[in-house]
Amino acid sequence: MKPIHYFDRAAGTVVTESVMGDGALRFAYETLLGRTLWPVLFGSKILSALLGRYYDSPRSRSAIASLAAIPGCLADEAEKPIGAYESFNAFFTRRLKPGARPLGDGVVSPADGRLMLYLNADADAPFPLKGATRSLREVFGPQGTPPVPNGRYDIAVIRLAPVDYHRFHFPCACRTPDPVFSIPGRYQSVNPIALIRYPDVYADNERQILACEASFGRFWLVDVGAFGVGTIVQTFSGTDHAKGDEKGYFKFGGSTVILITAAGALRYDEDLVRYAADGLETRVRCGERIAVSVDGAPHL
């Protein structure tokens, strides 16, 4: 498989992604035996639960140093020294030092990750991500696709990797009048190796969907579970949220946050649009600006 590249906003350059668990993922998704076993093992909530139990235990502390050594982990931003974390999951779900993610103006990224844009899409249009193709109708599943003016959507897919900060936040001031809608599913990896070989991740993995109301209209946040992520934890309470308020976190594994708005409600930053048009993800940090609201845009 070719190396995975993305544009790193902070570094101002295209970089090659370091993939944690590369060998195991290649076995699972690129060999006949692995593809035969994945429905029993690699898509199993039981296996995810067992991994979660291990990574919650003190025995897993030795794995922290390996993760911290991967380029891009930025372990120095953690609120505590590495040695103070009692388990791998405690480090994986770490909070950051105050000021580590200053809030930009406009609408900000809800998570650290690699962002790809799919603009002016309809509910049935497949939106690819490193070989994966899924439509919004399939992602929303039994809940049904929410109606929007002209039936067109802008979609920002933010793919987290193990090196990333795994708490996610509200991208703007908003209200959440309805509870989170959960869709159970398997636990597939959202690593690019897995996405190329198994393109149904965003419709088959567990999803938790939250409808939000902001000054520019309604939008949706979809949290997607992945292989090794036994739990998506929602930490927010109440119905009124400030920009940057914590919404929740993922336990061990890479995963994804999808931000969905009516087409044209936001004007995404030019660099994100440009690199997306070239098929390249952009690495963004939680709290940095990704878009601004558009005056006169249709509200939901």
Regions found by a protein language model. Give the residues of each.
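Contiguous, well-folded functional domains in the mature portion of proteins
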Residues: 1-300
